[in-house]
Regions:
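RNA-binding accessory domains that recognize and position tRNA/RNA substrates
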Residues: 1-50, 54-60, 64-65, 70-72, ...
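Active-site regions of oxyanion-processing enzymes, predominantly non-cytosolic
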Residues: 316
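Conserved helicase ATPase motor motifs in RecA-like P-loop NTPase domains
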Residues: 76-82
């Protein structure tokens, strides 16, 4: 199987490059930037991509690849920091420049292989503080922006390319076409990566694990698909456990029980942990601490269950690529954005190995696998939900009052989107609440009430997202229902921040 190898220099978009390439049915793998030449050769890449990153090439501790990579006679594309590595390696000069974050117009100077069919100009997403002052002698400029005269370069043999912008994010017009040009036309990679093949290989590999597997299921698509993949491989050696942590959506506990007991043929146990979780969260306001508390309590309950119902050899989790990259667990130098409750090493005293069959996949790939495994349709269309639940949709301390407000308000948002036939067209929609209050008028009296924030976004894979432009009439209807049906709420706001710079969840 042909493969594109992406060297991770710490960009939060590194996995997104792989994701985009997989859309072409070409396998892409992310590896550490300092991979040895020997190990890179073993991967036998059809092409190599250098990701972006937060470093500057002129820093003494700047991450750099093995210089012999450029002698492999394999096409190379450098993105942002990767572009600067190429310039620096071939004798050009990088300088500190005015930071450029956001959209810029890229003017095409030469329809090189990677810019073939792109047109005269496109909007490109910039995220950098350095730029090429002088390009190497053997290179030519193939694209520029107002602030970057060498935003795209290519060597004269058309085998090494550097671009200062990010083609992998949806904010770059025709960015997918640029990557496709590199992968399919420059690298000539075969398109033979499919989810059907992934399922086949995963089942074969999982069938080799020894002992019994304990799988925590949340009722979401990630953990459900992970459980079904494992069950397909090892059958009744899998035990699924659902923990009601008191942080779920309205009526979700009952829906999960019905789905597993009536639709899916797996061993299933429900544990009521509401009091345990909420008591541990009492007084906790820091978002990272809340995530850690939720993660620790899941581990504590699984440990107790394992001791009483074991022995188990593995603990299975529905960890995805975005979870890993946002938690900084990838092997590149990425900064931690936030810690996901199901990522990272388990404590030694748990005595269980981790099984994460979806760790290298993105959300939409998981949805494709769900269809292959005949997952119920209502689960396929349900919006993503964070592992720590409503704890990260409540700003400040988690209280029963805030949980009730968030549940009811989120349910109103979902109902109105469904009534407008828009629920399946958006990626995610929910309500969040914090500690701030605002004055309102009820009857002839003033009162202070909670502020509810409505967050609705469009996305492909959760790595980037754009806020959804709803009709004003629908926003008004949602707002009126929330303030009329929830006594504690006086104000409703609509969040218009995209990812980046914001994240999809508030915490």
């Amino acid at each position: 199987m042909d493969k594109i190898v992406v060297l991770d220099f710490g960009s939060q978009y590194s996995h997104l490059i792989c994701r985009r390439i997989r859309d072409f049915s070409v396998y892409a793998e992310l590896v550490p930037f300092d991979i040895s030449l020997e190990n890179l050769n073993k991967l036998n890449p059809k092409g190599i991509i250098f990701s972006g990153g937060p470093s500057s090439v002129y820093d003494s501790n700047a991450p750099v690849p093995d210089g012999k990579i450029f002698q492999l006679n394999v096409p190379i594309l450098g993105i942002c920091y990767g572009h600067q590595i190429i310039v620096n390696n071939f004798g050009g000069k990088i300088k500190r420049a005015n930071k450029e974050y956001g959209s810029s117009v890229l003017t095409i100077d030469n329809n090189s292989d990677i810019l073939n069919g792109i047109g005269d100009s496109v909007r490109a997403w910039m995220s950098h503080g350095d730029e090429a002052e002088d390009i190497p002698e053997d290179f030519e400029i193939i694209g520029h922006t107002e602030n970057s005269r060498s935003a795209a370069i290519a060597n004269k043999q058309k085998t090494v390319f550097g671009i200062q912008f990010h083609p992998e994010v949806v904010h770059t017009e025709k960015g997918t076409e640029i990557l496709k040009n590199f992968v399919l036309k420059v690298c000539n990679a075969n398109q033979n990566w499919t989810m059907e093949k992934f399922v086949e290989n995963s089942v074969e590999n999982i069938s080799k694990v020894d002992g019994n597997v304990l799988c925590g299921v949340s009722g979401g698509i990630d953990s459900t698909v992970a459980a079904l993949l494992i069950h397909k491989a090892i059958g009744n050696r899998l035990k699924c456990v659902f923990i009601d942590n008191g942080l779920l959506r309205l009526n979700e506990v009952e829906e999960i029980e019905n789905m597993f007991n009536k639709n899916l043929e797996v061993n299933f146990t429900k544990i009521d942990g509401q009091e345990q979780f909420l008591s541990k969260l009492k007084g906790v306001t820091d978002p990272e601490e809340k995530r850690k508390v939720v993660g620790e309590e899941f581990v504590n309950i699984f440990t107790k269950f394992s001791k009483e119902n074991g022995p188990f050899t593995y603990l299975a989790q529905g960890t995805l690529y975005p979870d890993v990259i946002e938690s900084g667990v990838s092997k590149g130098p990425a900064d931690v954005i936030k810690t996901h409750h199901n990522v990272g090493g388990l404590p030694d005293w748990l005595h269980l190995k981790v099984l994460e069959p979806l760790r290298e996949l993105y959300k939409d790939e998981v949805r494709n696998i769900a269809k292959i495994l005949d997952v119920p349709e209502n689960l396929l269309t349900r919006h993503p939900f964070p592992g720590p639940g409503l704890a990260v949709r409540i700003i400040g301390e988690v209280t029963k009052k805030k949980l009730d407000i968030t549940r009811i308000a989120s349910n109103i948002v979902e109902e109105e989107l469904q009534n407008a036939e828009l629920y399946d067209k958006v990626w995610q929609a929910y309500a969040a609440v914090g500690d701030d209050k605002a004055v309102g008028v009820v009857g002839d009296e003033r009162k202070y009430g909670n502020i509810v924030m409505i967050r609705i976004v469009d996305s492909i894979d959760a790595m980037t997202a754009d806020w959804t432009r709803l009709p004003n009439e629908l926003i008004e209807k949602i707002s009126n229902r929330i303030t009329n049906e929830i006594d504690e709420v006086t104000w409703v706001s609509y969040v218009v921040s995209s990812k980046p710079p914001a994240t999809i969840e508030p915490q």
